[in-house]
Amino acid sequence: KPNPERFYAPM
């Protein structure tokens, strides 16, 4: 499962 703490969403 993905880690929301390490999640990065580029614009």
Swiss-Prot record:
Domain of life: Eukaryota
UniProt keyword Secreted present: yes
Lineage: Eukaryota, Metazoa, Chordata, Craniata, Vertebrata
Alphabetical UniProt keywords: Amidation, Neuropeptide, Secreted
Predominant place of localization: secreted
Protein name: Ranatachykinin-D
Function: Tachykinins are active peptides which excite neurons, evoke behavioral responses, are potent vasodilators and secretagogues, and contract (directly or indirectly) many smooth muscles.
UniProt key word Cell membrane: no
Modified residues (Methionine amide): 11
GO biological process: neuropeptide signaling pathway
Protein localization: Secreted
Similarity remark: Belongs to the tachykinin family.
GO cellular component: extracellular region
